[in-house]
Amino acid sequence: MAVCYKARRFEVFKANVEFIETLNAQNHKFWLGVNQFADITNDEFRTTNTNKGLKSNSMRVLSTGFKYENLSFDALPTTMDWRAKGAVTPIKDQGQCADGKCKAGSNSAATITGFEDVPINNKGSLMKAVANQPVSIAVYRGDMTFQFYSGEVMTGSCGTDLDHGIAATGYGKTSDGTSYWLMKNSWGTTWGENGYLRMEKDIADKKGMCGLAMEPSYPTK
């Protein structure tokens, strides 16, 4: 039984490495790499390592409006990285979670008792919020490019069936002019850019890449 299991895992590993090498040979702005998910199928990946059910309704505060609404874009910094300001906790590994049992991945910096929502599908409002504090983000992370992401700015299309929580901890622009959101994940430092992900910021879809603009919120307490 153990031999069969190892043989099966090796076949999965080889198929995943082939996918990684094929994509990396194409003209993308980002690249993939072998990581802790290399010996599981994408179907297996989609049923684990998710923290669906990020916020309970009881944790939401009554909406009194978006508190950053009246900020001028001219007053916003052109780049932001909350890590440099000491406002981001170290990367953690949530382990293999399923069925909505992991809920702390995007808001682990402190004990949080309430949230306010950022206006949905509104990149400008999201930028105002992230310029002032880290923001909880829900995304779809079932795509294989998300599974094996290793560096640079992730571009392209992906789904919007939100199933995972990450935190927007900044934004910026690469030397070639590609704008991005800086995201903190909860899969350890062996995934992505030492546990972080950069996602393309200026795209046509108002929902944002992988639905990142659909359910943003920030802690109030």
Give the location of each predicted region.
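Catalytic-core signature of thiol
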Residues: 1-221
